[in-house]
Regions:
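Bacterial Sec-dependent N-terminal signal peptides
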Residues: 1-27
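Acidic/histidine-rich, surface-exposed loop or edge segments in extracytoplasmic proteins
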Residues: 37-56, 118-120, 191-192, 432-439
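Second-shell loop/turn segments in exported
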Residues: 50-58, 122-126, 194-198, 247-251, ...
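Soluble metallo-hydrolase cores and metallopeptidase-like ectodomains found primarily
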Residues: 62-116
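Active-site/substrate-binding loop(s) of hydrolase catalytic cores
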Residues: 110-119, 127-284, 290-296
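Hard-cation-handling environments
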Residues: 278-474, 478-481
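Substrate-recognition/cap regions that form aromatic- and gly/pro-loop-enriched pockets
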Residues: 431-436, 444, 451-524, 528, ...
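Accessory, solvent-exposed terminal regions and/or long lumenal/extracellular loops of proteins
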Residues: 526-529, 534-622
């Protein structure tokens, strides 16, 4: 009994602590909106858990899937399929909403209707999309929204990170207003799914990419909730903007999609905004930064695939109900727009897929900044004093704040005051392409890189397998310098990998590729993606993610008693080598005093030296 009293007391204490954490959050703005009419009445047999609880809670995995299975069984418009299993054995389900009788991938594509693929719960604490999708699919099946499927097919993944969804707690996201039970950011392997699109380590992202390959959606939506600053917007969303490899799609998202969605959201009482990342994390007046991350991110990956991609970031400080309803409106608005504009978007997409740049940028830079920035490194960067052009401006619907000095840490921190204000701020954009790589005809990959080949296949990249050895004239990279660690050279693992960066020197050579090698032509829609994954200087290449660490290991060597007389003989036989040796010692004093380095240098000049040492094994056919 004492143990039971302690348990109950502990629960009450934890609930009180959770409530106290919520009370520390900035003041909440009162909200009423037309979209509240979408909330089911209490007597509706298909009312969701979120609606029933007044948007205090969200259903767990079992309850969610049980509800969906009943809904699907009752409606001829809905089909439910498992697209994969998590490492803990949970099915990752996708709901297909279509007026077509046959909902196979081939049949849906043959129907000619544009396909919207939307996913929720890639970060399962940010679960608004799941509850919004439940409500919308309910209204499509049994409400007044059936007509949404007249000209569009809708694929919906309610929970992508299913294991993390069950790692639920009221303490997972202290800077977010509801629901009371929130899932975890990373999956059961502690991997962030929204850093996995390029390397595809996880079953969850492999499942999503398989859906992309099979169904070929015309638009892809990834629904999140922010971490960060306060402002008036309850929903922010958009594509990459002008930065990226799909200019036609970018233009459509900016000039057609965003205005239409903004109009519908505003009409329903919401305040939509563009994607926001503060340049200074305690002072938004310093500006906003929009950058293109690599294809590790969902929206950047979609851009590399030439697939219109929308990143949704609901505002964490707005109440759960308001965020869910905003997501409902956005999903419905997207379906309506695709019904009239989906054909045009398909044509634009095909044009982007046909682009074959002679030189492909591996990154995008903010012209007004000296430093490279990305989503994970954008706060407090330095602005260039010699900027080529002034940045755009943005009328930010912000919240008044003040900077306080902490009595605990003695550092400055921001306090949001809950008062709406409008600020005109600079809006920095990563629109300058950089780190260009000349497009090769294709890449040759030996069978020893079978893991890389398998991952490229999973991406849907087309390749040819050779059954006989083939000698090919190729360009190959020799790694001349390399550093382990992230962009700041911090030697620590990131997303299950030890990252590496290096400089390369190109070597033209005839290389024998064994049977089982593959050839990947860059003359294909996913040619740019292949380049970003295979070029070592790309931050999201398999080289950079540490898949080729074995090339940094030397496995054969020569003893000094062999190398010393050989080096002496080499100098006697070649005055040119003697001159090169003297110049090397004069230029590198550390080398001149290091006997091992000297003998290694001579060893590298012999035919005994391992030619594969520091040689990146992928060949470029020019």
């Amino acid at each position: 009994m004492k143990k039971l009293r302690f348990t109950i007391g502990t629960i009450y204490m934890l609930i009180a602590l959770s409530a106290n954490a919520q009370s520390i959050l900035p003041p909440v703005m009162e909200w009423k909106g037309k979209s509240e009419s979408f909330i089911a009445k209490t007597n509706n047999p298909w009312i969701t858990t979120a609606e029933k609880s007044g948007f205090q809670t969200t259903p767990d995995y079992k309850e969610t899937m049980r509800w969906f299975k009943k809904l699907v069984a009752a409606s001829p418009l809905l089909t439910m399929v498992s697209i994969g299993k998590s490492v803990e054995g949970r099915d990752i389900y996708m709901i297909m909403a279509s007026s077509e009788k046959n909902t196979t991938a081939a049949a849906l594509k043959k129907s000619g209707k544009p396909i919207l693929l939307a996913q929720a719960g890639i970060h399962s604490g940010e679960i608004d999309g799941k509850d919004a999708g439940m409500m919308l699919l309910r209204d499509i099946a049994f409400g007044n929204k059936k007509s949404l499927l007249n000209k569009v097919n809708f694929l919906f993944i309610p929970i992508l990170s299913v294991d993390a969804h069950e790692h639920s707690s009221p303490y997972n996201r202290p800077n977010q207003r509801g629901p009371q039970n929130q899932g975890w950011r990373t999956n059961a392997q502690n991997l962030n799914l929204n850093r996995d699109y390029a390397k595809i380590d996880t079953r969850e992202i492999r499942s999503v990419i398989q859906v992309m390959n099979e169904y070929d959606p015309v638009l892809y939506m990834d629904i999140h909730v922010t971490d960060g600053v306060d402002y008036q917007y309850d929903i922010t969303f958009g594509g990459l903007g002008l930065q990226g490899n799909s200019p036609g799609i970018a233009q459509w998202l900016e000039t057609t999609y965003k205005p239409a969605a903004d109009k519908d959201l505003t009409a329903n009482g919401h305040i939509p905004g563009q994607l926001l990342t503060a340049l200074n994390d305690i002072d938004f007046s310093k500006g906003n930064v929009l950058t293109a991350g690599g294809p590790r991110f969902s929206d950047s990956y979609g851009n590399m695939r030439h697939m219109a991609s929308i990143l949704v970031e609901n505002h964490s400080l707005k109440p759960f109900k308001q965020r869910v309803l905003a997501t409902y409106v956005l999903l419905e608005s997207t379906l309506k727009l695709l019904a009239t504009q989906g054909g045009a978007l398909k044509e634009i997409t095909e044009k982007d897929k046909a682009i074959r740049l002679a030189k492909v940028p591996m990154a995008w830079k903010v012209p007004q900044m000296d430093e490279m920035v990305n989503f994970e490194r954008s706060a407090n960067v330095k602005i260039s004093v010699a900027a080529a052009a002034p940045p755009d401006s943005l009328n930010l619907l912000g919240i008044a704040s003040r900077i306080l000095k902490s009595p605990v840490t003695n550092a400055d921190y921001v306090e949001w005051l809950g008062k709406p204000i409008t600020m005109k701020i600079v809006n920095y954009k990563g629109t300058e392409p950089t780190d260009f790589i000349t497009r090769p005809k294709g890449y040759w990959i030996p069978p020893s890189c079978d893991d890389i080949i398998a991952r490229l296949k999973l991406h849907g990249i087309k390749m040819e397998i050779i059954n006989e050895p083939r000698e090919v004239a190729v360009e190959m990279y020799r790694i001349t310098k390399y550093v382990y660690g992230d962009d700041n050279h911090q030697l620590e693992p990131f997303e299950g990998h030890m990252q590496v960066s290096g400089t390369t020197k190109a070597e033209t050579r005839k290389q024998l590729f064994p049977a089982g090698s593959v050839y990947i032509s860059t003359d294909q829609p996913l040619g740019d993606l292949a380049m970003v994954l295979l070029e070592p200087t790309s931050k999201d290449s398999y080289f950079s993610w540490g898949f080729f660490l074995s090339i940094f290991q030397r496995t054969e060597y020569m003893e000094a008693y062999v190398m010393e007389p050989m080096a002496k003989k080499m100098l006697e036989d070649s005055s040119a080598l003697q001159k090169e040796f003297e110049e090397k010692k004069a230029a590198d004093k550390v080398f001149a005093k290091d006997p091992t380095a000297i003998l290694t240098w001579f060893y590298s000049k012999t035919k005994f030296y391992d030619d594969r040492y520091l040689l990146y094994p992928v060949g470029r056919e020019l």
